[in-house]
Amino acid sequence: MNLVKLSCLALAVAAAGSQLAVAGQAESKGFVDDSALKLLNRNYYFNRDFKNQPGSQSYREEWAHGVMAEFASGFTQGPVGFGVDAYGYLGIKLDSGRGRAGTGLLPISDEGRAQDEYGEAGGAAKLRISKTTLKYGEMRTEAPVFATAHSRLLPETATGFHIASGEIEGLALEAGHFTAYNNRNSTNSDEALYLNYGSGEVGKTIDFAGGSYAVSDDLSVALYASRFEDTWNQYYGNLNYTLGISEGQSLNVDFNLYRTGDTGDALQGDISNTTYSLAATYALGSHSILLAYQRVDGDTPFDYVGGDSIFLSNSMQFSDFNAPNERSWRIGYGYDWAGLGVPGLTTKVTYVKGTDIDGTDADANGGYAGFYGEDGEHSETDIDIKYVVQDGPAKDLSVRLRQAFHYANEDQGEGDLHEFRVIVDYPLSIL
């Protein structure tokens, strides 16, 4: 396992610099004193209404409550620090039905009914030398080529090795080797890795390495590479720059690029895909306006492993606007109501239009054949309203309303739908 060897080598090199290691560990207060225990209560209502699918389940509606406890120990003192991370998640059905299940909030039985409750627990062992940390076990990840999601009730987790290093100021490096996945509505932490769009057999492991560097307070860059066994090699780059125009006025430019090509046994068929997005956000006081363009160059969609591994500007509430050869444009407006004396209240309205979809040249023996037509197009309008309590006994409690309207022609494939979500989060820091 090359990644594990690399991780051990990196830790050995860090240990060799004993002065640096001792200095880094000297800041540790110990296993107990640096420990943190956090609790999150999440109440989630999800409604999705398909408008043009008479031959299948066209309506999904569920309501559930989740309780998530996460513990992170400190590190033992000394040149090498040891610690553990642990979590326990519980999901409870409040309302569902056989004809309304399938929102992703709750597991579904063989009879098509949502389970009354489900839960999971896990953890990871960790060690630290200086500012380099190695973990093994079940964890959440945030890399642009492999990121677990928390867009439904309970978080996703992945099982494997992860190493992160911050030895150089402004430079954050990480690498990972993962072999199993726990999906958002599952209690099985030993499930296979999965694709969001492909079908059929996929690789059993994913490896990645990369990092980000803050060139200045206004400019940052990121580079990553990953290998999904016998499926693809994927590369990612990001450039983010903020121009301060005047007091309360700024312009942010964010560029993201993915390059994906099949490798090994090519279990998903031939893949040669370059996808990028360019977004500009102008902020003036409490107002913000966003314009973005996204392009997919390839006969397969831009696909990804894990629920949140898509760092592109036009990935929306429902659609990712990532179909073969798709071009999409986005415009959005946001307002922070603190400007009118209501701190904690924010609103956003976004519209995206995607055209030129053509998936007819996808590998006929691959995992994406037959998904898209020759002249697909679609649009999505999202409305997002969120309020966070600023003080008092309910401080940090948030209420979020999300509405999406998606319309598509037959060649696009996702169909017409209306989707509404209500998410209430109440985080607590116990330790």
PLM regions and their residue ranges:
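Beta-barrel outer-membrane channel/assembly domains of diderm bacteria
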Residues: 8, 14-141, 247, 383-390, ...
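C-terminal structural cap/anchor segments
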Residues: 293, 298-375, 380-388
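Residues that define the transmembrane beta-barrel architecture of outer-membrane proteins
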Residues: 33, 61-67, 117-121, 155-159, ...
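Transmembrane beta-strand segments that form the barrel wall of outer-membrane beta-barrel proteins
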Residues: 43-45, 134-148, 173-175, 209, ...
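Surface-exposed coil loops of outer-membrane beta-barrel proteins
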Residues: 98-117, 122, 132-212, 222, ...
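Residues on the lipid-exposed face of transmembrane beta-strands in outer-membrane beta-barrel proteins
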Residues: 39, 67-73, 123-127, 161-165, ...
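Outer-membrane beta-barrel translocator/channel fold
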Residues: 174-197, 248-324, 328, 407-415
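Repeated loop/turn-to-beta-strand initiation elements of outer-membrane beta-barrel proteins
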Residues: 79-81, 131-135, 170-174, 182, ...
